[in-house]
Amino acid sequence: MTLSKVPLPAELRAKYAATRPRVLNRTPVFGFGYRSPWQLGNIIQARVAQKYRLNVMLAQQSVREIERTGRSFQDVVDSATLSAHAARLTRPWGADGDHLKTPADIRAAVKAGCTHFTYDVSHELAQGLNAASKKVGAMVRLTRTLKGRRPFTTEISLDETEHTTALEDVLRLLQTWRKQGLPITEIAPRFPGYFEKAIDYYLRIEHGRRIHDTAEFEQYLVGLLEVVRGFGVRICVHSGSDKFSIYPILAKVLHNNVHLKTAGTYYLEELKIIARHDVALFRAIYRFSLAQFQQDRATYELSADLSQLPDVEALDGPALAGLLKSGCGNDHLRQILHVTYGSVLTARCADGQPLFAENMIAVLKRHKADYTREMEQHLLRHIRPFLPA
């Protein structure tokens, strides 16, 4: 018996239009970033997109994410192509090269077939509006040269700064880019409050407690919408995973004029399945993550407190899985596991074999029904406020 050949991503893209990333013109847009290298969750994302008729960036990773996972933009786009084919996705989907900072980043994203380019000028913004504006111009022009006649969309990321982006600055930047003839599709400001990884939005910390007040966020969002309205620009929200308290506000204020980016907590959903069904493996991952945390947290804004961690060694699998649920109140554990994803996924034994990755995928495959159910429910929590009534 001859085994059928598994088609390569490039072969699929050459043959089937639905497996190629495309420009997304309809809104809202959902960024379904997926960090793990084994596609299982990416396929579920594609199925959810098909079922609920979503506009998705099925391929979405930042430069930081691909560096930490040892992948490339091409790997991410190829995973999305294979996932779209496996899920029989017929809706258009996009590929987002996220947080691009250098010409090399842009070239890699263009070569991989990305259709959406997120330019991170947070560093330049700290030097002044002129520096940020100049950097955007250079990046957009390079992308235009490399893409040729192929269409693409653009996004300006201002979110990785210490202070809320002034609405006056947003207006001045958009006016400048319009005068320069630069096609700006989206803008991602630094909003009031905190969009920390793996946990819900909060406004500030008082006496060691997170204050979950959304009034200031909503007021800023209303003002931002007024600023961008005349420019035809979409508003993008970064680090949008598990920010459940603000989804209804985004839907109410922006209607469909929003691009919500999510990524990291799909990895936590996988750890939830592993905790439930292979507690020894989960504990090993936890111990490794704890050892890596101080190093891996360096590029993230976090408020995790190691003194608030549960006794993982004393809890059984179902109890640990319960602690990994979104909004369960154990934010400290979730943040520590969240930001160490790259170290866990790329860890190697002395002989060069994966320390965790192969065992992780084996558990997920053995418990595919449970994994699929949890992932679908998690995705639905993110998209439900934006679905038609």
Predicted regions and their residues:
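Active-site capping/gating regions of soluble enzymes
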Residues: 1-79, 85-87, 103-128, 132, ...
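Aromatic/His-enriched, Gly/Pro-containing loop or helix-boundary segments
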Residues: 80-82, 89-91, 95-100
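Residues at beta-strand starts and edge strands
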Residues: 91, 150-152
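Hydrophobic "anchor" residues on beta-strands that sit immediately upstream
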Residues: 94, 155, 234
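Short glycine-rich or small-residue beta-strand-to-loop segments that form or flank ligand, phosphate
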Residues: 153-160
